[in-house]
Swiss-Prot record:
Binds 1 zinc ion. Keywords: Metal-binding, Zinc. InterPro entries: DNA_gyrase_inhibitor_YacG, Znf_NHR/GATA. This is DNA gyrase inhibitor YacG. The lineage of its organism: Bacteria, Pseudomonadati, Pseudomonadota, Alphaproteobacteria, Sphingomonadales. Pfam families: YacG (PF03884). It comes from the Bacteria. Zn(2+) binds at C14, C17, C29, C33. Its cofactor is Zn(2+).
Length: 61
């Protein structure tokens, strides 16, 4: 089966608003959604889970 080319590659949806993405702002649809995503990261709206190693080992004192 041939791999998808740019011409017939499936279009994605913007993770912020759900609109079709644009190549210039991919994976977003616009500069506004791209900037909103950045502000979410900078404002701690997004968080990565962190495992507390000190609670497990107790050897960090």
């Amino acid at each position: 089966m041939p791999s998808a080319t740019r011409k017939n590659a499936p279009k994605g949806k913007c993770p912020i608003c759900g609109a079709p993405t644009k190549a210039e702002f991919r994976p977003f649809c616009s500069r506004g959604c791209r900037d909103r995503d950045l502000l979410n990261w900078l404002g701690d709206a997004y968080r990565l889970p962190v495992k507390d190693l000190q609670a497990e080992d107790g050897d960090f004192d």
